[in-house]
Amino acid sequence: MPAHFQHPWRSDFPILNIEREGAPLIYLDNAATTQKPQVVIDAISHHYATNNANVHRGVYSLSQLSTEAFEQTREKVRCFINARSITEIVFTKGATESINLVASSFGEYMFHQGDEIILTIMEHHANIIPWQQIAEKKGCIIKVVPISENGTLDLDTYKSYFNSKTKFVSMVWVSNAIGVENPIKECIEIAHNNNVPILIDASQSIQHLHINVQDLDCDFLVFSGHKIYGPSGTGVLYGKERLLEVMPPYQTGGDMIKKVTFEKTTFADLPSKFEAGTPNIEGCIGLGASIDYINGIGIKDIVLHEQGLMKTAIEAIQSYDFLQILGYNGSNVSALSFTMKGVHPHDIASILDKKGICIRAGHHCAHPLMQFYKVSSTSRISFALYTTHDEIIQCIDELASIYALFS
Ligand code: PMP
């Protein structure tokens, strides 16, 4: 591998040693999913090779070992986001399921005809459709906070939306489509000044920013394991205990009950009440390994490294007038969206693929945001802790060649 592609953390990720199209893999689609370090891969195979049994059920020691390893991850997640208690950490299969859980359970319990829910125009579909579904069922209204051209949330409109009918806010912290960071603490304060609970979609923050849910004081926070160097099919819902306590179960079945008779079922305490059925045991154990891995490096160093990458990318993209960045306001975190004059994003991504460079082309599951920018798709580059400055420069140099080819 050429020296300029080397990075202290890179060698921890076996896939990054693989060549694609005769060149080292340049993976710049980290907002879609991150690559996995060897320690995560090892944790999963170690579990299968030595500890595998179902959790929370067996009195035999193998099941207890499996349960311990699984539950250790809950404590690791609690510590990582500084939740007050492990009762506030619910395992799900991803951010999507976490949001669906809150929308349908909290919505079922709290929403009534004419109530209002606040979202923003930059939400991922996973933070739109669950709210639409419950709004339709309960006769609620969704209000959408706009942004300015550079991606900045319109806080005046946000503030003006609150009234006695407002029941919930659900908002992304960092946009997956344009990388803009919302002033999340301020947004939480505004919601709370109006006595409205707020869910934070931290899918694109958990791997790039330091998160402290007690300091943020958010009511719910969600993320996916696969975006934080962990396995797919794992996710977390953080919720304040007093809210989770009063919410009805989302799914029902084994492992979430105290007692079942054909007349009546009583439900288990938190967090089991929201974890029906056999969970993704090995996935959660892998997630625990990914959190250990991040802690081993230190989120502060990751933040610094990725801020440097953003500076490199912005300067390089802005040096070409045929590239137009969508939604850049200086707050962007590890993702940038752009268009190229006269060239379709899918053509760009296909040509880069032939050079071993993976970037995302499409609507990024954010149709309303694409409609706002009057485009059907964009090209997006997104970074991770193993991304190097040279990879970004090489990718952007290739963009110049593609533009030359098409013009
Ligand atoms: N919200 C945001 C901001 C995301 O980026 C994503 C994934 N792209 C999701 C929600 C949904 O995550 P998942 O598909 O892992 O459930």
Short names for language-model regions:
Residues M1-S407:
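Pyridoxal 5′-phosphate
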